[in-house]
Amino acid sequence: MTSQYAGELCTLLVEDNFGELFARIFSTLNRYDRLSFSRLKFYSRLSNAQLRHGLAAMIQQHLVYHYTSYDDGITYYEPNMQSAYYLVRSGKILELIEHRLGKYAATVMSTIMFLGHAQVGYLETLPALRPSNSDVNRASEERGGIHETEEYHGEEARQETEEHRETEGRPNGLNSDYTSSERPALLHPTLKALAGHGYILRVRDAQFQSYADNALDAERTIKSRPDIKALKGKKLDEAVTEGTLELLKERLDGDLTRGLMFNGVPRGAKRRHTTGATEASNKKARVDYAAVDEDEDGGEENEWSDDDFGEDTIPMESGITVRINYEKLDVALRNRRFLELAERDSSPVTAEVYESLLRRIEYQTAKCRDTTEIPREGEEGEHYSVPVPLRAVVEDVDLFLDLAGSVGPMEVSQPINRRGKRPLEETTNGAAHDGTNGGQSDGNRTYEVDQHLCLLAQPPYSLTSKRMVSGLITWTVEFRHLARKLRHLELERIIEARYGDVALRVVRVLHDKGKLDEKRLQEISLLPFKDLRQVLASMQTGGFVDLQEVPRDALRQPSKTIFLWFYDPDRVGNSVLEDTYKAMSRCLQRLRFERSRLKEFLEKTERSDVKGNEERYLSEAELTLLGQWRAKEALLLGEVARLDEMVAVIRDY
């Protein structure tokens, strides 16, 4: 993100969220990239006090990296473009957290996002994080839910009603010196839920430095070790590379999920359990699927329920400093795009089964890509997710979903004899034996979930992949394949919108066949030469296709030259990404201009006595103007959010 328009966009985001001082420092660092304090002061034309206060606050917000050189002892500063860009994605992140963990969790997440990073002890003192009675009641009501939800129990959600009474309203199980004003009842369970899902992480010192500075520092440390100095040649290079990567991982690791996960699921996540009939042996049809149930039912997973860990009253350590884990949130947002892709050609039931698989995979996936650079088309290897056992997916799927009806007609349980009648069921004193039938029904459910996942594994998207691990059926997702598919669909959508369906057909042919001359391209695409040439010329002007000249001799005469048309998805993706940055920055600039035109009117509407009472204090003309402004603002911000989806697909996923 070092291009002109990306830097312009990040500067606008910083100015819109933090003000002119932050924007001036950030734009100066973006222009000159890496500066010492004295040079930054010279270029920004700021005083010492302004610059020191601004840098301290920007480091708090992770908008600026700083590194003190070992050679001269000078501290250098450089902009954190990625963190600045994530300001535009904050609304989607809070919406995702509220959907999964509730409104109070979104409030906690918003507070941490506003502070940049914060100690748990400081969060305990904030009045905004003391839950209201509605939050407490909502947390206690969610205990009986069937769908997978994260919940907080009523006994843990009591809080003090009178501030001067320090000994009342204590949650059960805590020490006598505890007061609800010191530790809000819902704060620590919420922080544990956020940490268990990986949405927040511990702040480490190395996170305030750029990856390049951390890599150089780690390499210098590894080379100074006596055992490394004894090596030479190729072994030395391999040892330094391996040691540097391990040291980098150790220094940058801020994972807080250790101790908060159980069998790959965060503690407190609502789980559905099958009936006890699954323990019965199943010797009938679909033995393989019933065997999956029998092998895994006897393990530790069925021994754990939500109530075992729901009443965890042990608070988090007050000295831990936490921040937002944007890489993990990118994984959650990417899974949501995969789910939208599955909903195009599958039933809602199949999409819900796929959501259960993606949720399991998300818990064990730290980030979207191991490398920060976007890999070129064809050069990135296949990258599969962790294998998820079929039985784990079955447990997470809603018990009331009609799995069989959405796949096909239900099978006849018993054959009909020659007389057209069904045989009598085996009964004892008029009562049927239901032990075997219970096991068979659970085996049928496992089989039906597997059939839904098999439907998702079919072309053209191949959303899932089936594997056998130690004799057990597991399912995975091929991330790089689906990420490429999302990029191709996004680029094809843009081409079709700009140049029509004929251009889309030509691009698909070039992408599938490679470089083609005009005659061969016309034969495959079945288009008239006139239409084909017009489409190729317009797309070449827009930069979506290009032409390569291959001379047959050294004279390079046009009559003896082959002209090959080709489509490069990488180059087109980079061009579209730059255009998207430019469009987002223009939307923000337009929004700022519209605000400046209505500055006095907007200041009036934002007054504390007017806000919420617009009909009382504003005239009819002012109400009309306010409605027009809100519609225009929603239009521009909605366009920025839509463009951010394109950036995420092309760059992040």
From Swiss-Prot:
Subcellular location(s) per record: Nucleus
GO biological process: DNA-templated transcription
Alphabetized UniProt keyword annotations: DNA-directed RNA polymerase, Nucleus, Transcription, Zinc
Any one Pfam family match given in the protein's UniProt record, by short name: HTH_9
GO molecular function, one term: single-stranded DNA binding
Gene3D superfamilies registered for this protein in UniProt: Winged helix-like DNA-binding domain superfamily/Winged helix DNA-binding domain (1.10.10.10)
A GO CC annotation given for this chain: RNA polymerase III complex
Compositional bias segments (type: Acidic residues): 293-311
Region (Leucine-zipper): 580-601
Residue ranges of the region described as Disordered: 131-181, 266-285, 293-312, 412-444
Source superkingdom: Eukaryota
Biased composition (Basic and acidic residues): 138-169
Keyword check for Transcription: yes
Homology family: Belongs to the RNA polymerase beta chain family.
Assembly description: Component of the RNA polymerase III (Pol III) complex consisting of 17 subunits.
Reported function: DNA-dependent RNA polymerase catalyzes the transcription of DNA into RNA using the four ribonucleoside triphosphates as substrates. Specific core component of RNA polymerase III which synthesizes small RNAs, such as 5S rRNA and tRNAs.
Full protein name: DNA-directed RNA polymerase III subunit rpc3
Organism encoding this protein: Aspergillus oryzae (strain ATCC 42149 / RIB 40) (Yellow koji mold)
Lineage start: Eukaryota, Fungi, Dikarya, Ascomycota, Pezizomycotina
